[in-house]
Amino acid sequence: IDRLPPYVFNITAELKMAARRRGEDIIDFSMGNPDGATPPHIVEKLCTVAQRPDTHGYSTSRGIPRLRRAISRWYQDRYDVEIDPESEAIVTIGSKEGLAHLMLATLDHGDTVLVPNPSYPIHIYGAVIAGAQVRSVPLVEGVDFFNELERAIRESYPKPKMMILGFPSNPTAQCVELEFFEKVVALAKRYDVLVVHDLAYADIVYDGWKAPSIMQVPGARDVAVEFFTLSKSYNMAGWRIGFMVGNKTLVSALARIKSYHDYGTFTPLQVAAIAALEGDQQCVRDIAEQYKRRRDVLVKGLHEAGWMVEMPKASMYVWAKIPEPYAAMGSLEFAKKLLNEAKVCVSPGIGFGDYGDTHVRFALIENRDRIRQAIRGIKAMFRADGLLPASSKHIHENAE
């Protein structure tokens, strides 16, 4: 446990709760926790199945066969990829559980794992919990991530056993095309490295862009697995259900460790997940469209304040470089300042890795009126610091 540092996000969470206890109205962009309702047809299926007396026993660690077949059809319909539901698919209690258990099942003390920096914390600390050594690969502006990945493999001793990837990225919202995965699979085969890809934001995409799956690459299943969670696409974060597909050996390894750790997900939840994957997908498009509208309001408002953040083309996040006058503070102190003075709560980039300390992350979990209120608070803070003249909407400084 000593290898796990205190969770940075707890610091801002505690400050947020303290402010709310004082009666302050805090606009919360900190956690990527969907605020919308799960689509009604999914909830109705859960309620119907939960009424049956034969659905309340232990499930199976791999997941019920009907759901694994639905997962296979989902990949076929979406990516034109064939997945064997018996040997290449497994249901997980959300992707976070699956990622952590997969690393426990496959990594030994002393193994090296390559992880982007910044990255979703479980990508880093799942390996740490398993006793592995993590080598960070910079995922930052102006650096070719694939070249850095290849260099890390060549220079690491012992040779890395696994790389953990996640695109669209949390927290950076960085995206890749299928060509990137083609190069990753070739690289992994050349150096005999396993690839774990987290496709959590497959559906949260904008402006006509589509997120590729690593499973679309011929031969990917020789070296790779991919996780998907229903949390974001279907507003099912609290339901804790997802799945992993791909390499048979890794699927079997995860199934074995899960057979000791859990009895799988509550059966009515799994049947509801079938309804999600096989039902009308307009609800998914509607959820993505809601995030897009929020993205547009937030980015436009920050630009009006002179905070020139990039417009993400996927994910539910805006990865915002700290304006130059505040850059020396680092992300945690800047996040505290936003909370105290603008009444806006964000995630400090340092919580995602050292290379994230120049940024903060906004999660698009507040409605548009609340986002506009947040922009007013940020502008007021900038004005108080002399960066935004009282009569102007713009900061006269180089914020990016």
Language model: regions and residue ranges:
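Short, structured beta/alpha segment
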Residues: 9-12
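Short beta-strand to alpha-helix junction loop
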Residues: 60-63
